[in-house]
């Protein structure tokens, strides 16, 4: 039998002394208080605490925002005049080619009249919609003579899953079926 044996008994027997002595407790520096050798401590370096300046975590835009250009200062605000002043960029300095709402009004298409809706036949709209989704009207007319049966309409063999093909092994299983029978085992077998 293999195994490991560990003895929990200590080999050294501790003899108790009749006199009591106080144990030396180490100080912060790891030296006992009663130790006469270490009487002076020299500190060679002192770490200076550096205060970190907290910067705001925001991204300032390079150009003033359009909303701040149009904003009017409130009369009861306590900001100085320097903080309220907004510098408007010159037209040559502006990176944006913004001409205002009049440029947007020129690009709006004309409103469609009811007469134009009546000109488009409903059948034409339906075929256009189907062509946009990939329908080919010429392919439908050619294949109308040959009507193909869909996969779910075709008969398939019993006990065979979807997409599985019937093999000769599965045919032989149907003809020669032997059910499982439980047999009692005895000690002699």
UniProtKB/Swiss-Prot annotation:
The membrane-spanning stretches of this chain are none
UniProt keyword annotations, A-Z: mRNA processing, mRNA splicing, Nucleus, Spliceosome
* Signal sequence extent: none
Question: What's the main place this protein lives?
Answer: nucleus
Q: List every stretch annotated Disordered.
A: 1-28, 54-156
Keyword hit for Cytoplasm:
no
Q: Does the keyword Nucleus apply?
A: yes
Name the residue ranges with Basic residues bias: 10-26
Query: According to its UniProt record, which protein family does this protein belong to?
Result: Belongs to the SPP2 family.
Name the job this protein performs.
Answer: Involved in spliceosome maturation and the first step of pre-mRNA splicing.
- Assembly state and interactors? Associated with the spliceosome.
What is the official name of this protein in its record? Pre-mRNA-splicing factor SPP2
